[in-house]
Amino acid sequence: MDLNGDSNAKRKRSSISAAAERPAKHLRPENSSLTPGDTTPANGTVYDVEDDAESSHLIPIAAAPADSPEWQATIEEVVKSVVSIHFCQTCSFDTELSMSSQATGFVVDAERGYILTNRHVVCPGPFWGYVIFDNHEECDVRPVYRDPVHDFGILKFDPKAIRYLKLTELKLQPDAARVGSEIRVVGNDAGEKLSILSGVISRLDRNAPEYGEGYSDFNTNYIQAAAAASGGSSGSPVVNIDGHAIALQAGGRADGAATDYFLPLDRPLRALNCIRRGEPVTRGTIQTQWILKPFDECRRLGLTPEWEAKVRKAAPTETSMLVAEIILPEGPADGKLEEGDVLLQVNGELLTQFIRLDDILDSSVGKTVRLLVQRGGQNVELECEVGDLHAITPDRFVTVAGGTFHDLSYQQARLYAIATRGVYVCEAAGSFKLENTLSGWLIDSVDKRPTRNLEEFVEVMKSIPDRSRVVISYRHIRDLHTRGTSIVYIDRHWHPKMRLAVRNDETGLWDFSDLADPIPALPPVPRKANFIQLDGVSQPAAAEIVRSFVRVSCTMPLKLDGYPQAKKTGFGLVIDAEKGLVVVSRAIVPYDLCDINVTVADSIIVSAKVVFLHPLQNYTIVQYDPSLVQAPVQSARLSTEYIKQGQSTIFVGFNQNFRIVVAKTAVTDITTVSIPANASAPRYRAINLDAITVDTGLSGQCSNGVLVGEDGVVQALWLNYLGERTPSSHKDVEYHLGFATPALLPVASKVQAGEMPKLRILNMESYVVQMSQARIMGVSEEWIQRVTQANPSRHQLFMVRKVDCPPAGFSTTAHDSFQEGDIILTLDGQLITRVSELDIMYDKDVLEALIVRNGQEMKIQVPTVPTEDLETDRAVVFCGAVLQKPHHAVRQQISKLHSEVYVSARSRGSPAYQYGLSPTNFITAVNGVPTPNLDTFVQEVSKIPDNTYFRLRAVTFDNVPWVVTMKKNDHYFPMSEYIKDPAHPAGWKTVSHDKAKHKDGIAPDAANLNPDAMDEGFDDVSELEPEVRLEVGHWTVR
């Protein structure tokens, strides 16, 4: 904490948005109270999910006394000039992540249409927004100026667009701010339409508050008052009783104190006048931060009594002087000024205030100024050339391989006292997702070539072919002592364009241009390698199985199917070395819109593709090209016998360091489980499976591995299962359980034979009922006796817990389909007491089922569902929302599909985020035209002109219909599609509907989408690659 107590400062930007007004769904979490007889893994590995939403600390405010008639008259006039600003920063840039929010501004020029607000509202990066006036008229705005340092910016609107309100403006009167003055803060406090807060100015000479990481104002004094403003009041006018704006609301305290900080209006008034005259707003700098220090501190720094006397005589009301706090390396003052220098004169003029210092520097860009400072009691005269502050404030960025880059800004350099040079990663995504941090990296070199600035970085990236692996050297701005080195996989197929965005202050937009087309990938080359040998391991079977493990890394360019991550890594088991077939957890490879890389023997990296995704049992089969692998890879031998409870086995797994670990153990339990459904957004989960647990603590530390017998035969796979997200902590639960290999054989054998399995499944989820429950529910004693004979180890039957919503065009009647509560006795005459016996459904179109319903035995003909239609084969990205057909997990959790246009995810800072189109909603109509499927949806939204409002009729997951109005934005969020195409090298093709770039509006292309900036649930979280919190002890089930 500094002398002003800034450790608890916060900016006043609302965290309330339209997205918070209508939750997407209210599905009851299933991990709180389980249905009797249900069995769910009890101990799941939990990993953290960070929340990207800013907290809005609402402070209780005592009732204010009634205003005087004078104040009432003033407020009535002031509110006509105050506007509520709804805005987005469409992508991360400099100190800010992409986001949607609300704030306040006020009209300062009604004739020309200028609105004054905060710099952190105007945003350093691409801005898109609108304002709402007091009479609820709406108007688009565009930025015309954002100050490089001070917290103010100016927006422009078209005054002719306001037809029903007589526009008025607030006069800026910075010299009217005085200690003891009564003020009112009129603004959009806490996201409300209008709030009026009262206060009294207590200080005029406060240093600018430090907000920590990110943007902070400096080199200006702030005004302090007690007004208790909250989120959303950023940019509010601080008015006196005369109705003049005397300051600009900027920040406050987050610890409950009712202290607020206001920016003086001297520099905003000067900038506004320059813009009115059509002149550039010049800003000068010597790359030095000054702070106000009182005379007693200045004396300790070496201020002599003679100079103190001169200052006090020249400015009797002053109690402080300017002291150098930070001098940036390689700046104009580097080697001349020193930290702790007390500023006496500039160009021979005695100077104690920021305002006059800004005046001199802003009028001296490109010129030299003379400074006189005292350093330890000695006078030091020096000259500094004044630089252009705009020149060291980035106004362009480059997107390539999924990441976003620009030159290091003065803001960031000042915060960490480093030189204003280097390539800054403002959005670490795609190929440049480094160490799970969203931004803040400085790229020192790429492919062994230095990248000292953005131009050098672009030239290096132009020469790197697609799918190359290159070495990069980098540091994080928070820890410049530590240099990191990583090998990154350059993705120029999902992100083919290298785009340059340049700020255009005339239009308020950022103009995009393509810098270079991708260089095609080089042909892969066969490599040689050998596997490690386990030292000191007494089990030969464990030593042999090492040759059957490969590391599998999956990177997803788009969030689909509710999956929360963009990258996942684990281990797979080679089941056919000659054909390159590997079985891996579906929690690692959830769908086939992805890049899969297989690492063999920790040496050879080859790409792979998805061959088969099992709809129920949590495994994926992928295939790599074995001709590229010259290593003794061994096909794992899979057991045909089910492992039994109490049986001895050898656990072989991989820990969090990707190191193999071995333990002799025994099977503690085999229980039929279903992974709990995720409450916030449906996503793939395993159901109807027998889960194996073992008696070793390593099972909790290892997410992948096998259980292998003494003879080297694999008895079970050890897989990680993605579970539910806890509603209170927003953490995902991951279960580690064994899966018996005989259940894998029916599918694996077909894949090995070159046949694509076309499974059919029963569209239901079941759970176990014991005989005591079955008897009460009407199962006869005869059947109970048969069950005990058929399955001596587990006396159980299966009850239908949930019937899936059938796919489109699939119709059944109540008589020939399962119902919730049915107890299954036989399928096609076979008694069903084990999960594995349900596999009879794989090859049958219809099954004859003997069930007990409402206490009565009956036979029904139950149709099975083909699994080919369960996987996603198309996604439409529209206004930042990812739309797809409802995937299998949705059908498992819902009773009725309202349409085939399902919102799977949305991007921060997009229209979908701004207007509250949340994931898990169904879109049923566009402008009154029904859109039952993606084809009709694309057809209708293509008719909507850019920057035009349209209506979407939607239905929440809980069957609540509602209407959302949105404004289309083709400039920043053009519509694109991902369509599965087996003929395409990546398995999917991309199509762009950007009419500004393609004449007919359709061409092969892809937007530079960042899945890490998407949320797939309504809890608005930004996913990071998780770090697993390890559970010590046994895994148990209940």
Curated annotation (Swiss-Prot):
Active-site residues, record numbering mapped to chain: H120 (charge relay system), D151 (charge relay system), S233 (charge relay system)
Record keywords: Apoptosis, Hydrolase, Nucleus, Protease, Repeat, Serine protease
Positions of the PDZ domain: 289-374, 877-958
A Gene Ontology molecular function term of the record: serine-type endopeptidase activity
Family: Belongs to the peptidase S1C family.
Residue ranges, annotated region (Disordered): 1-47
Cellular localization per UniProt: Nucleus
Region span, Serine protease: 82-275
GO cellular component annotations of the record: nucleus
Enzyme Commission number(s) of this protein: 3.4.21.-
Composition-biased stretches (Polar residues): 30-43
InterPro entries: PDZ, PDZ-like_dom, PDZ_6, PDZ_sf, Peptidase_S1_PA, Peptidase_S1C
Protein name: Pro-apoptotic serine protease nma111
Disulfide bond keyword on record: no
